[in-house]
Amino acid sequence: MTQVTVKQLADEVKTPVERLLQQMREAGLPHTAAEENVTDSEKQSLLTHLKSSHKAKVEEPRKITLQRKTTSTLRVAGSKSISVEVRKKKVFVQRSPEEIEAERKRELDERRAVENAARQKAEEEARVRAEEEARRQPAAPSAPAEAVAAPAPVAEPVREAAPVVAAAPAADTRKRDEQRRPDKPRADDNNRRGGDGERKNAPHRASVKEKAPAPRVAPRTTDEESDGFRRGGRGKAKLKKRNAHGFQSPTGPVVREVKIGETITVGDLAQQMSVKAAEIIKFMFKLGTPATINQVLDQETAQLVAEELGHKVTLVSDTALEDSLAESLKFEGEAVPRAPVVTVMGHVDHGKTSLLDYIRRAKVAAGEAGGITQHIGAYHVETERGMVTFLDTPGHAAFTAMRARGAKATDIVILVVAADDGVMPQTIEAVQHAVAAGVPLVVAVNKIDKPGADLDRIRSELSAHGVTSEDWGGDTPFVPVSAKMGTGVDELLEAVLLQAEVLELTATPSAPGRGVVVESRLDKGRGPVATVLVQDGTLRQGDMVLVGSNYGRVRAMLDENGKPIKEAGPAIPVEILGLDGTPDAGDEMSVVADEKKAREVALFRQGKFREVKLARAHAGKLENIFESMGQEEKKTLNIVLKSDVRGSLEALQGALNGLGNDEVQVRVVGGGVGGITESDANLALASNAVLFGFNVRADAGARKIVEQEGLDMRYYNVIYDIIEDVKKALTGMLGSDVRENILGVAEVRDVFRSPKFGAIAGCMVIEGTVHRNRPIRVLREDIVIFEGELESLRRFKDDASEVRAGMECGIGVKSYNDVKVGDKIEVFEKVQVARSL
């Protein structure tokens, strides 16, 4: 017998000696020291104690797992063999006799309960049927009296039908019992495992099967048949059939609440209405609008579709991010007076920039291309009466959007009208912009030093458009000025500052900066540059700004003279560098707390703008499909347009898209801010377009492609020139018209016969000149009866090339011999005339 010491045993089982001694004392062993010996029987006693303390079962394992593996070889074509290995695994669980007995008793009790319930139900049905027959008995007097005792034969069918009727309740009862005791193994499990439960439960199932064909007491219904009450059916199948799930069609239309944002795709709309997308597409086809599952619908179209299909529509605004941004921008602080923002507006060449030059003591107008302003210029001027910020807007008709933007960003509008020119179209437009923006007007009647200046005529013309002078009882100051001589400029500034005092303009310098983009451009060395007018708060270098759908950190700020500054307060125009793109003029600028918020809102705005643009473009295309059917395709002049600033690009696109007619049109296939690059040249090459550069030039790569491919590239610095050239190009695309000019008219006085030419008309030329080999018309009583060619023209037997008015001649008409006296022969020519827009 092998003996080891307590210490050796502790080392062997990897436990401390003290811990092992304590466990041995708990097991009832007499060991107290590490040097004492431990016998095998003592080890067994210790092991038994440890197992019992850990609640381990010492009996034999109740679960046995058998695994079997067979390998076979499968031969395939090409003398190849594949080895196939099949593995099988079976688990046998030994059940205790107590569990088997309890299961048998439980099933016996259940069966007795089911039989009792079935017997009671059968007796109740027999009693009801007997009462029915008893009530019907008096209505048939011919029936024998002993028929009243009809309930007697009921007893035998009750006994035989009971097990059959009980099949479904038995399944329900068993199911409830299994739910109450989920840890008990089911009889079906025993069938699969092949345990003792199969042998014990088999007789009970067989007894139900044997009685199944018994006649039914009550007539079968459709529900009973669907629940598995069929003759000879198996209990398990009945249970599965009874528990099968299914969908029932709704008894009426289901009205759903559909939430529609600014845009929604056809697929998303169908999902919200719980219908197939094909139904919506089919409905839109009925409305005359072809659609696809991924097509973006605008809010109005989606609302119409949903309401027509009978659903309730809730319009929602996808502005959660915008609302949270607006909440974060709220700031309370002390408001202080600020300088007014004044926009100078008026017709082209009426002296707006010259007036500003005199106020600023600068020479801006002299350096402008063509002598006209083509950008919005922003300046702030320190005067004796305080600081004023001026916005100089273009006066050309193409810059309508710029002037509208200037009116929105301003406090006061100076309307410049030339005294010698009067009220012009852009003057009226400027008045409309100011009235729409609710901005007070100050009228500056410029060029008052010129002869022929008539101030009363200006007052009269403007009063017709709702601008009445203070001298005539209105509320608009009229100040006569001369930008050249400086006359009346001080009075003009005084009138502007007086209006500013009435408006009580205030701002909060301690708040985060907020403003509007006046202009933006792409500088080759500095990247996107935006001219921003700060309207409230203070903009500082290093601030994270969100500008429309662009964002970035302000890396540098420059004033209007190009000098770097660190911060800009209210009503100060500055140029900022550091944005990730060129924002659109008119976009709002705001300082945000962190870059994450700015990026989220910028990406949201970009996606929203793209969806709305796609929806509108697609709607426009679909509307034009049916209009253009059967018509000739328009000739299109494709243009790739690059400009120096965003505002000029918008103005040019608007002006060019407005050109054209039913036969020709302009399509700007690409546009942007900055120089002409290689990608622009490739786009022009692919789309067969003309390259236009407005105040920009092409780089080396673009010039190389233009030379190799022979592209048409033109530079401009005046907007008039672009519009004129495009008009000429469109005129050339129109082709030419054929016009007829009547050369002469001859009256037939007599008809002769010639063997060579047939009928010869002796004529007197009464109008113009008759030429040989020209087309003619024969008119009888001023009605055209023949159109052909003059074959022979003679005068006194001599051939003549032409015969003038008042002279006689002989005319032979080719292929026509029905000339009569009194007819008129009209000689004409066809001339091609160039068309114009």
Curated annotation (Swiss-Prot):
Residues 231-244 have a biased composition (Basic residues). The keyword Mitochondrion does not apply. InterPro entries: DNA-bd_dom_put_sf (IPR009061), EF-G-like_DII (IPR053905), IF2_assoc_dom_bac (IPR013575), IF2_II (IPR044145), IF2_N (IPR006847), P-loop_NTPase (IPR027417), Small_GTP-bd (IPR005225), T_Tr_GTP-bd_dom (IPR000795). SUPFAM superfamilies: Initiation factor IF2/eIF5b, domain 3, P-loop containing nucleoside triphosphate hydrolases, Putative DNA-binding domain, Translation proteins. Residues 137-171 have a biased composition (Low complexity). Residues 96-136, 172-213, 221-230 have a biased composition (Basic and acidic residues). Residues 482-484 are annotated as: G5. PROSITE patterns: G_TR_2, IF2. Residues 346-353 are annotated as: G1. It comes from the Bacteria. Keywords: Cytoplasm, GTP-binding, Initiation factor, Nucleotide-binding, Protein biosynthesis. It is found in: Cytoplasm. Residues 446-449 are annotated as: G4. GO terms for molecular function: GTP binding; GTPase activity; translation initiation factor activity. Residues 337-506 form the tr-type G domain. Residues 94-252 are annotated as: Disordered. Gene3D superfamilies: P-loop containing nucleotide triphosphate hydrolases (3.40.50.300), Putative DNA-binding domain, N-terminal subdomain of bacterial translation initiation factor IF2 (3.30.56.50), Translation factors (2.40.30.10), Translation initiation factor IF- 2, domain 3 (3.40.50.10050). GO terms for cellular component: cytosol. GTP binds at residues 346-353, 392-396, 446-449. It holds the Pfam family IF-2. Residues 392-395 are annotated as: G3. Belongs to the TRAFAC class translation factor GTPase superfamily. Classic translation factor GTPase family. IF-2 subfamily. One of the essential components for the initiation of protein synthesis. Protects formylmethionyl-tRNA from spontaneous hydrolysis and promotes its binding to the 30S ribosomal subunits. Also involved in the hydrolysis of GTP during the formation of the 70S ribosomal complex. This is Translation initiation factor IF-2. It comes from Pseudomonas fluorescens (strain Pf0-1).
